[in-house]
């Protein structure tokens, strides 16, 4: 991101400036490095309450349902959900919670689950609401695996298997898609734009119910956004989200809390004692 680029740029220049002043090097090679660079950070989008309800109704009883529920109501990262085992899910406690202690990784093309989390702050205990408790209790009764999310063999999902699971969501969206036909050895590209409420031609039971995009990270961003909307303080949000850097939390907080002109106006007037 551009923010990371700026930090690295400053660090590199400080190192070479010190080296030049100490006569370690004759000339500072970092003088010509541009101060601007990096890619702008992607704008994070959260699902609305209506979109959340549509998503859950669309995939109820389907493979991605439990994954989506954990993302929406516990805010775990994709790798934390895929690496989650039942021994870290405490549903019968007075205050039910998920203990984040493991993460899913791909090494040499194979899935690996270990205790290597994204940051030290990712190790956390997340209390979970009643709707997620009920969902996980039902999933636990049906499960024969040590993993909360597993394949038909009871083992951890591979990257390819996760993509297949997520496809249950993408095929129900109205996003434009392409397919190819081959005529006389020539590849011809076709575009189709499904309409909301229509049935898929090759599968009449499948209905296009979502006119919005959903990604795994959007579930987590929705969780964080909802905490902020409900007035949860930034430090608590930071802990629950497992953010190592408070800046990450505060950036989201500022965008969510003060993204409407009328809200900004009331804050400014209150600060200066105006009505």
Protein language model annotation of sequence segments:
Residues 54-55, 109-114, 230, 251, ...:
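DNA/chromatin major-groove-contacting recognition/catalytic segments
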Residues 2, 6-10, 21, 25-84, ...:
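Basic, Lys/Arg- and aromatic-enriched nucleic-acid-binding interface segment
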Residues 1-24, 41, 155-161, 179, ...:
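N-terminal core-binding DNA-recognition domain of tyrosine site-specific recombinases/integrases
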Residues 95-100, 149, 215, 226, ...:
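Short functional hotspots where side chains directly engage DNA or cofactors
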Residues 93, 108-123, 130-132, 152-153, ...:
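C-terminal secondary-structure termini that scaffold catalytic or DNA-interacting sites
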Residues 6, 13, 82, 225, ...:
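Key DNA-contacting residues within the recognition helix of helix-turn-helix
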Residues 2, 57, 61, 74, ...:
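Short, basic (Lys/Arg/His-rich) helix/loop patches that form interaction surfaces
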């Amino acid at each position: 991101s551009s923010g990371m680029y700026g930090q690295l740029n400053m660090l590199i220049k400080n190192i070479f400036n010190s080296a030049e002043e100490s006569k370690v090097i004759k000339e500072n090679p970092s003088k010509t490095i541009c101060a601007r660079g990096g890619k702008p950070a992607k704008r994070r989008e959260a699902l609305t309450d209506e979109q959340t309800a549509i998503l859950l109704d669309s995939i109820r009883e389907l493979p991605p349902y439990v994954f989506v529920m954990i993302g929406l109501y516990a805010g775990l990262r994709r790798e934390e959900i895929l690496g989650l085992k039942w021994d870290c899910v405490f549903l019968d406690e007075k205050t039910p919670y998920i203990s984040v202690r493991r993460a899913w990784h791909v090494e040499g093309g194979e899935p690996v689950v270990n205790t290597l989390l994204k940051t030290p702050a990712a190790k956390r205990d997340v209390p979970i609401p009643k709707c997620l408790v009920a969902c996980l209790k039902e999933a636990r009764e049906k499960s024969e695996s040590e993993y909360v999310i597993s394949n038909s063999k009871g083992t951890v999902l591979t990257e390819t298997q996760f993509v297949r699971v997520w496809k249950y969501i993408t095929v129900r969206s109205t996003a434009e898609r392409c397919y190819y036909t081959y005529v006389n050895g020539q590849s011809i590209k076709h575009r189709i734009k499904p309409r909301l409420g229509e049935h898929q031609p090759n599968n009449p039971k499948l209905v296009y119910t979502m006119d919005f995009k959903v990604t795994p990270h959007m579930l987590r961003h929705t969780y964080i956004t909802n905490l902020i909307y409900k007035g949860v303080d930034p430090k608590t949000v930071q802990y629950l989200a497992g953010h190592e850097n408070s800046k990450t939390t505060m950036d989201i907080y500022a965008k969510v809390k003060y993204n409407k002109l009328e809200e900004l106006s009331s804050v400014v007037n209150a600060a200066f004692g105006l009505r």
